Swiss-Prot record:
It holds the Pfam family Nore1-SARAH. Residues 61-74 have a biased composition (Basic and acidic residues). Keywords: Apoptosis, Cytoplasm, Cytoskeleton, Metal-binding, Microtubule, Phosphoprotein, Tumor suppressor, Zinc, Zinc-finger. Coiled coil: none annotated. The keyword Cytoplasm applies. It comes from the Eukaryota. This is Ras association domain-containing protein 5. The modification Phosphoserine is found at S177, S274.
Length: 413
């Protein structure tokens, strides 16, 4: 057998038999070829004439039995708990993304507060001006203070309070922070001024103290000395705030971009809300040797996004001596990291506490001459009232002593 030429097929290909083709004659009209039925179309929809043509006719010619129609593919059942998703056609209408500008309903798990449980009484601010816990403005003369939670406000702000009293049943319901279990408690608290007279150390002395401090530090929070003589380190501040703090409401948390660019998210809204911080919460700060108490307070308020005036708070140092806890209020110009370096890393020896500035320094330059004269008049009146009370008290003692002497003279022995 001769081999086929190059480019020709060596053997005939075995293909499926093609359906018969109908050629239109010149004399008459021939019916068009029938359409091939789809797989999923039921048998009842196929016309009899179409079924007898094409493959059906060839099957009948061979004598093969009629195959049973294959059922259409059924859709998958939807799993419980899931909604069936509908697929949009390409180019179909996309529904508009409508977002509400109105306030969403509050979480039902958050209990609504109505300012209940407070026991307000008049408070005379003799040591200096105070601060309103509701509006944040300064209180100069008369204020109202709750006997339980120490909530302080203007008399005109009393009807606007919505925060419930935290200590309705007394001071035993203080919410302790989880960190408070790590700190030993003492029975006696004595507020006493501790005077320290020390000369400023040299760079060599500071280096020796830092080496000694880092050798005793067990939590990898040592201090680092720079070439210019300054040093950096960590301090822990205990927050013992009994009065509520004011924070902005409805803002997003501070992002890394805001922290780098020093963007304050609280400045983007005028809405305010108040809440109680847990007692004895601990906050750690990384500061330098030149950081003052005023900057530490401002840094703490910025971390918690508190919008209250920094003069409302004060930083105290707490030392343990002879079984007693001694508190000393630090000046706004003191450097806490230097005190931490002198005391060592042990928090039982020295710790820092942030409290309300109840006995703040009075800025007399902020008052006018008539106001200062009014203060003098009030002080003189209070002084005279105190003198009259003491005179009346000792006059009663004198009368009782004289009566006792007269009764004893008539009795023998």
């Amino acid at each position: 057998m001769a081999s086929p030429a190059i480019g020709q097929r060596p053997y005939p290909l075995l293909l499926d038999p093609e359906p018969p083709r109908y050629l239109q004659s010149l004399g008459g009209t021939e019916p068009p070829p029938p359409a091939r039925p789809r797989r999923c179309i039921p048998t009842a929809l196929i016309s009899a004439s179409g079924a007898s043509e094409g493959r059906g006719s060839r099957r009948n010619a061979r004598g093969d039995p009629e195959p049973t129609p294959r059922d259409c593919r059924h859709a998958r059942p939807v799993r419980p708990g899931l909604q069936q998703r509908l697929r949009r056609r390409p180019g179909s209408h996309r529904p508009r993304d409508v977002r509400s500008i109105f306030e969403q309903p509050q979480d039902p798990r958050v209990l609504a507060e109505r300012g209940e449980g407070h026991r307000f009484a008049e408070l005379a601010l003799r040591g200096g001006p105070g601060w309103c816990d509701l509006c944040g403005r300064e209180v100069l003369r008369q204020a109202l203070r709750c006997a339980n939670c120490k909530f302080t406000c203007h008399p005109e702000c009393r009807s606007l309070i919505q925060l419930d009293c935290r200590q309705k049943e007394g001071p035993a319901l203080d919410r302790q922070s989880p960190e408070s279990t790590l700190t030993p408690t003492f029975n006696k608290n004595v507020c006493k001024a501790v005077e320290e007279t020390q000369h400023p150390p040299t760079i060599q002395e500071i280096k020796q103290k830092i080496d000694s401090y880092n050798s005793r530090e067990k939590h990898c929070l040592g201090m680092k000395l720079s070439e210019d003589g300054t040093y950096t380190g960590f301090i822990k501040v205990h927050l013992k705030l009994r009065r509520p703090v004011t924070v902005p409401a409805g803002i997003r948390p501070q992002s890394i971009y805001d922290a780098i660019k020093e963007v304050n998210p609280a400045a983007t809204t005028d809405k305010r809300t108040s809440f109680y911080l847990p007692l004895d919460a601990i906050k750690q700060l990384h500061i330098s040797s030149s950081t003052t108490v005023s900057e530490v307070i401002q840094g703490l308020l910025k971390k918690f996004m508190v919008v209250d005036n920094p003069q409302k708070f004060a930083l105290f140092k707490r030392i343990h001596k002879d079984g007693q806890v001694l508190f000393q209020k630090l000046s706004i110009a003191d450097c806490p990291l230097y005190l931490r370096l002198l005391a060592g890393p042990d928090t039982d020896v020295l710790s820092f506490v942030l409290k309300e500035n109840e006995t703040g320094d009075v800025e007399w330059d902020a008052f006018s001459i008539p106001e200062l004269q009014n203060f003098l008049t009030i002080l003189e009146k209070e002084e005279q009232d105190k003198i009259h009370q003491l005179q009346k008290k000792y006059n009663k003692f004198r009368q009782k002593l004289e009566e006792a002497l007269r009764e004893s003279q008539g009795k023998p022995g």
